[in-house]
Structures are given as C-alpha cells and as structure tokens.
Amino acid sequence: MTFRHCVAVDLGASSGRVMLARYDSKHRTLTLREIHRFVNCLQKTDGFDTWDIDSLEKDIRLGLKKVCNEGILIDSISIDTWGVDYVLLDKQGQRVGLPVSYRDNRTTGIMPQALVQIGKSEIYRRSGIQFLPFNTIYQLHALTKQQPELTAQVAHALLMPDYFSYRLTGEMNWEYTNATTTQLVNINTDDWDDTLLAWTGAKKSWFGRPSHPGNVIGDWICPQGNRIPVVAVASHDTASAVIASPLANKHSAYLSSGTWSLMGFESKKPYTTDEALAANITNEGGAEGRYRVLKNIMGLWLLQRVLKERRITDLPALIAQTEALPACRFLINPNDDRFINPDDMRAEIQAACRETDQPVPVSDAELARCIFDSLALLYADILHELANLRGEKFTQLHIVGGGCQNALLNQLCADACGIRVMAGPVEASTLGNIGIQLMTLDELNNVDDFRQVVSANYDLTTYIPNPDSEIARHVAQFQPKRQTKELCA
C-alpha cells in the first residue's frame, strides 16, 4: 500500500485536536491536517478542579466521525495526553466520579508525608522520577484518605489516554511511557512498585502491567462499520514529542515547549545518582527502551494565564511590544510552586517581584517580558545541570511544540544557553504519535528512521546565540533557587 492514513488524537491541558496524517511510503512524505479542534478546561465539581471528560470524549468521537464521513479509510488511531491524571472505574467499567486535575490543591502537604514515611532517596531509587507535588502517587494518597467512599467503588484506574482508548475499544491498557509519570513504576522492573503503591492506599489490582508503545489495544468501529485498530503509542504527550524531535546527535538536548516546558536528553540508561536526585531530574520512559532524562519547567502556563486574565487575543502584537523592552528588569523563578494555579497570575508575578525587591511589572508587555526572560534564564540553568549530570556539554538544543513558534523566546533561549537552537516541528506530539503508528503498521523501522522523515518534511528555524545580548551577560548572575522554593519543595 502506497498511502497510509493515521489519526492522532492529541489532548493538551488547554486544548485538544484530532489530526489526520497521510504518509506516502514510496516517497516518504508525511502531511498533517487538522480535522477538529476543541477546548479543554477545568471545571469546579464538589469543590475539586476536574476535567470535563464526557465533553472531551464527545469531541474525540466527533473528530473521528468527521474523518470517516470524508470517505477516508483510516489505518489506525491513537491518543496522547498530559501525564499523571487518571480516571477511576467500577467493576462494570463505569466511571467513578470525575477525574481530578493535577492542578487541584488536594495534594497540598501530601508529598512531605511520603518523604518522611518512605524516604526521599528510597522513592527515587525505586522510581527514578522527579518530585512534583501533583504526581499520581500523591494524588492517589489524597484520594484514599479524603474520599474513602469513592475508593470503595473502584476496580480499575486508567491514565487519561488509556481511558479514552478504553472508551473507543472496550479494552484496558496501561501504556508504559505515561505510567512512568506516576512515580509508581519501578525503574528496574518496568512494573508497578509494590511499596510505593501500598503507601498510596490504592490496590494493585486497579492496574495492569504497563505495556510498551506499539501494541494494538483493540478496534474502534466507525459509523460505516469498519474496524479500525487503536494503537498504544508513547501516550504521554512529551514522550511523543521527543520521538518527533530531529535530534542531530548525542550532544543534542530537547525542549518540548508548551503549557509545560520539558528539557532533557535521550539516554539508554537512567540517571539515579545522588546528584540527579539533588537536581530533581526525572527518568521518564521513552520508546524503544530509551529514557527521557529531563526536568519539568512551568513553561508557557504563566503566559497563558496572563493572556486569559487580561483578555489578550493578539499575541504577536504583545510579543512585538515585549521585544522593545529592556531585558532582565523583572525576574522570577517560574518553577516556584506558587505559580501552579494561583487565583490571579498577574498579581502572583507582581508579588514575587515585590518580595525580592525588584521593580514590579505593570503593563501586559512587562509581564510577558518577565515571563520570557525568566524562562530563558531557567532554561540555561537546567541545561547546565543536565550537562553536568552526563559529563558532556550540549552543542545544540531542539525546541519543539507550540512554544517553538515564539521567535523572541527562542532567541532569548539561544542567548541564555549559549548554544544553537533549532526550532520545530510545531506539531511534535502529534507527529510522534503518528510515528509509532507507522512503525506498528510496518511502514517505518524505528524512531531514528522516523526522525529522518520528520527532518525531510518539516522546516526548522535556526537561532544563533548572541554572546553580547543583555540576557547572555546576565546568565552567570541568575540563580533560580536563590529565594524561592522549587516544585520539588
């Protein structure tokens, strides 16, 4: 077969898309077309920040039906989403309650309990995963302690992409790359860790053994009656984004830039040394047995909240105003957990500047300048940490995802990090999703083969560092941990 048509459902924390890919195996050309886009936002339910999962499922099905109604024969479907959140099911496979978002405050104070009762080093030795207060391990502990009436009804717990695949196929699956984000998978066995799971109060019977990307979960029957395989890809959106990152060589780092920024490198081995623990480095699962050695950064979430609060719709105009302002007048640590979900992001940023005796950003452009400069400087700090961890410097940084369209931030990143930045592709998560589908269909050999396809079909933009820029001169002075606490607490 010359042409393949694959559908990727890519769900982010603020929006979702159903994308159609067309792959010409003879010429190795790959194109994407957006079929359906929809909003994903939090809602308050019984005092919790929850996801409107029924609305998301409705939009997923609508997008799939749109493809089928065009008369296109779909070869496969797959779903990727954000990590750590889950859906509870009873014995009949019906949902128990609504899925609570990782941004809900129910996990406040939970992680310190685990550090005392299990031990920080022991948790890291077992999982290799960074300490974030909203990891699934702490969410489940909060669930079992705060909502025992729900816990009593639970027979299964599915992570978000696995839940939607279940709704399409009727088959349950626990995909490995996303499972590792829970901080509950043992890094040596690739299975759920008995000690960590027991601490949460959740039953091991809620979970099946994690499966690696590339297996067919089951079939979705389209309105025309065709059975279409649903593939388990690297279902954590960052894992998919890394697959589509055209990394030039082992000296290339990546930055998946979106609501979250995730900076790291690929490795055939995990890094679980005391140094890695001290830096709060994570070793998330990737495709083909590779590890994604990385660190979470709050990312463009801060900007997204400011845009929403200030009702700003013309982002290019705001960026143009921001670029005209001097650099490094207002600096914050984007990874301070005060920015996870404040009532008023603008006020929180201003308070952080005020508390550190800095000028206070007032205009929208000043707020954006504060966010961009602070992110770029934090990127530089973390890239330095990662280079020290592996004992080799990086020569190139690949920025992928929606954030790579921000030319100002890309240049600030290049200047602050002091290395060449390659920006693109924008649709990295979707492309990585498609890549695993094409491998499952035996159209591609492996991840490296797919990256060649990406490089041949998608243009990258190069940013050369300017050592004389204001932000480059400021790098040595910037200490993101100086007066703030990290997400790891």
UniProtKB/Swiss-Prot annotation:
Cofactor requirements of the protein: Mg(2+)
Regions crossing the membrane: none
Disulfide bonds: 68-222, 353-370, 413-417
Keywords: ATP-binding, Disulfide bond, Kinase, Magnesium, Nucleotide-binding, Rhamnose metabolism, Transferase
A GO molecular function held by the record: ATP binding
Enzyme Commission (EC) number: 2.7.1.5
Catalytic activity, as annotated: L-rhamnulose + ATP = L-rhamnulose 1-phosphate + ADP + H(+)
Gene3D superfamilies associated with the record: 3.30.420.40
A biological process term (GO) from this entry: rhamnose catabolic process
Sequence similarity: Belongs to the rhamnulokinase family.
HAMAP family according to UniProt: Rhamnulokinase (MF_01535)
UniProt protein name: Rhamnulokinase
Naturally occurring in which organism (per UniProt): Salmonella dublin (strain CT_02021853)
